[in-house]
Regions:
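Surface-exposed strand-loop-strand hairpins of Gram-negative outer-membrane beta-barrel proteins
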Residues: 25-28, 60-99
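Residues that define the transmembrane beta-barrel architecture of outer-membrane proteins
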Residues: 48, 98-102, 148-156, 172, ...
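Residues on the lipid-exposed face of transmembrane beta-strands in outer-membrane beta-barrel proteins
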Residues: 41-43, 54-56, 104-108, 118, ...
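Outer-membrane pore/translocation modules
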Residues: 121-245, 316, 370
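Residue-level detector of the transmembrane beta-barrel scaffold of outer-membrane proteins
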Residues: 51-53, 115-117, 157, 173-177, ...
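Extracellular loop and loop/strand-boundary signature of outer-membrane beta-barrel proteins
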Residues: 39-40, 88-92, 139-146, 204-209, ...
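Short loop/turn motifs that connect adjacent beta-strands in outer-membrane beta-barrel proteins
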Residues: 22-29, 40-49, 61-65, 113, ...
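Outer membrane beta-barrel transmembrane domains
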Residues: 65-67, 71-84, 247-389
Length: 389
């Protein structure tokens, strides 16, 4: 699938469309004309207008990796302790994970240079776990599924235009992105699906929680250029984790770099290709219940005993990843855009063992609503002329 996606990315960007014309883009001309919907992009939207985005997203993870090397689940399963010594084996290991998200973003352009918005998120996690032979005998099951779902963290965001070569129809512009993630997602989710009743009151591991538990600032720099029918851009974003949450840990800092190119081959359609690079650090600290042994240890309430699964080790989080993404945008009606994109990893180096990403898919419905103060506001539809048309 990875090779096929890269092939089509190259083919669609290289192919010649003889019917291409000079377009101003599917979005408003002031914001740059075209911009990606799955990442922050473009400039500042038309002044005094609202923007809304509804984006369901699905990500699939499958198989384990340590660094760049694939490892099998069976190689990690076994007796965690033998003759009083830890073996490095685990009672259960993850084999796959499905993550579903629904994002709703609302924003408003306050001036020619300033845009503000808020993004609300709902998340559903499902992770398949395989048991060791000992646990299979104890539970009578070969595996089980950990689940969590609910409201995730909320993002407040803003963009300030630093530079533009034209105030109305820019072909080059740069913007400053700034944001603050609010800890509205739960960090108290429990392992209620575990087949052993004594484990059902334990907390879920870090990656199955719904939020970070901290207020996390984000800052970024966005650049976009265009020469119709082509658009391109680069976005660099950094998210800092500055302190431990109420459960005595904090997620690792994150850095993201996105490069994108777009080709508008019709007045209401375009194709896009992206390279999405990301780095995220290890978890700092340790969950309070893991420190006391109440959750995540082979011997309950004994924090000196080994972890039940590699998911409880804070060092098994973080890494580097590069995705190749191919997308399509369609404008079915004025002020509306439908965006579909699919991304697959072309490189992953993980602080493992941890699950590898297989692919992700996102569908976005984007709507622009001019207010009465916008230059694009239309008071009423034009009637028929005296000639009847």
């Amino acid at each position: 699938m990875r090779k096929t996606l890269v092939y089509w990315m190259v083919l669609l960007l290289a192919v010649y469309f003889p019917s291409a014309h000079a377009y101003i883009g599917l979005c408003c001309a002031k914001c740059g004309g075209n911009m990606p919907m799955n990442i922050p992009g473009g400039g500042i939207p038309e002044t005094k207008e609202f923007r809304f985005k509804l984006s369901p997203m699905y990500m699939s993870m499958d198989g384990l990796a340590d660094g760049a090397d694939t490892i099998s689940a069976n190689s990690l399963l076994g007796m965690p302790v033998m003759m009083g010594q830890p073996t490095g084996k685990f009672m259960a290991v993850p084999t796959s994970m499905d993550m579903k998200m629904l994002n709703f973003t609302a924003g408003y352009s306050f001036s020619d240079d300033l845009f503000g918005g808020v993004m609300l998120m709902y998340k559903s996690n499902s992770m398949d776990m395989k048991f060791s032979p000992m646990m299979q005998t104890t539970t009578g099951q070969t595996d089980f599924t950990m689940e969590s779902s609910g409201v995730a963290d909320t993002m407040l965001m803003g963009k300030y235009r630093l530079f533009s070569d034209d105030p109305l129809v820019p072909t080059r512009e740069a913007s400053l992105m700034f944001g603050l993630s609010l800890p509205t997602g739960s960090i108290d989710e429990q392992n209620s699906n575990h087949p052993l009743a004594m484990r059902q009151g334990e907390r879920l591991p870090y990656g199955m929680q719904l939020g970070s538990g901290t207020y996390d600032p984000t800052v970024g720099l966005l650049y976009q250029g265009s020469k119709s029918p082509y658009w391109w851009g680069a976005n660099a974003m950094y998210t800092a984790r500055l302190y431990n949450n109420d459960r005595d840990y904090r997620l690792g800092d994150e850095f993201r770099l996105d490069l994108y190119g777009m080709f508008q081959f019709r007045y209401n359609m375009l194709v896009e290709a992206q390279l999405n690079g990301s780095y995220w650090g290890k978890i700092h600290g340790e969950m309070d219940e893991a420190k006391t042994g109440a959750s995540g240890h082979v011997t309950k309430n004994d924090p000196t005993s080994p972890y039940t699964t590699p998911l409880w080790d804070p060092n098994n989080y973080g890494g580097r990843k590069l995705l190749a993404t191919l997308g399509f945008q369609w404008q079915p009606a004025p002020f509306n855009i439908i965006d579909f994109n699919i991304g697959v990893p072309v490189y992953q180096h993980l602080n493992g063992p941890q699950l590898k990403e297989k692919y992700q898919v996102m569908l976005t419905w984007y709507v622009e609503i001019p207010t009465r103060a916008s230059i694009r506001y239309v008071k009423q539809k034009a009637g028929e002329s005296s000639l009847g048309f």
